[in-house]
Swiss-Prot record:
Membrane topology field: Multi-pass membrane protein
Species of origin: Danio rerio (Zebrafish)
Annotated family: Belongs to the TMEM160 family.
Name of this chain's protein: Transmembrane protein 160
Gene giving rise to this polypeptide: tmem160
Protein's UniProt keywords contain tRNA processing: no
Region (Disordered): 181-208
Subcellular location(s) of the protein: Mitochondrion inner membrane
Length: 208
């Protein structure tokens, strides 16, 4: 009986072991990934708690922030260079207009044209600079007070240019009008003196 039981047990174990292995493999497939995920999560938490790793991450974030600041500064400088180029062209056109304004009547008309050209350059440069500030404020890392300050500086520069041109044109117009009046009065005086001399000559001839 003992031998029969031993033979039956060995045969059953032979049939049961392969079946148990087949059942065990898919179960382990679904069980092992969560275990690995938990293990990775614990390792990651331990790495985050490590002060050396946290310092390295802080240094990396600070480095990226410095790069962003450098890019924003370069962008601001490029926009300022664009505005200054437009303003310089406006001043150049204004200077040519000043030179042409004092030449003659034709030069005066050309001077007005150059003044208008200078105003277009100054106004377009200022408007494009302010628009770029408002649209790219976040990329330039500028706060609202800084944007308002830049806008006030650009507007004041354009206003000073307009005041200078207006005062110069007005003063030249006044001087030109005075010169024309003096010439007319001088011509009148010279004509009157000629008439007076003619009268004197006539009176002298009658006396003789």
């Amino acid at each position: 009986m003992a031998s029969i039981r031993w033979l039956m047990g060995s045969r059953l174990s032979r049939f049961v072991c392969p079946f148990a292995q087949l059942v065990r493999q898919p179960v382990l497939r679904y069980v092992r990934p969560p275990v690995r995920a938990l293990h990775r999560g614990s390792v990651r938490r331990a790495a985050e708690k490590n002060p050396l790793n946290s310092r390295a991450r802080a240094v990396e974030q600070q480095y990226i922030t410095e790069l962003d600041k450098a890019d924003a500064l370069m962008l601001r400088k490029s926009h300022e260079t664009g505005f200054l180029s437009w303003f310089r062209n406006g001043l150049l056109a204004t200077g040519i207009g000043v030179i042409a304004f004092v030449q003659s009547d034709v030069g005066r008309e050309a001077g007005y044209a150059f003044f208008i050209l200078g105003g277009m350059c100054v106004s377009f440069g200022g408007a494009s600079y302010v628009t770029s500030l408002l649209s790219l404020r976040r990329i330039m890392l500028l706060s609202l007070p800084a944007v308002l300050l830049h806008t006030a500086v650009v507007s004041s520069a354009a206003l000073f240019w307009l005041c200078a041109v207006s005062l110069y044109i007005g003063r030249l117009e006044v001087e030109i009008i005075h010169d024309e009046d003096d010439e007319e009065h001088g011509a009148d005086e010279s004509s009157e003196c000629a008439e007076c001399r003619a009268r004197r000559d006539r009176e002298k001839g009658q006396d003789k």
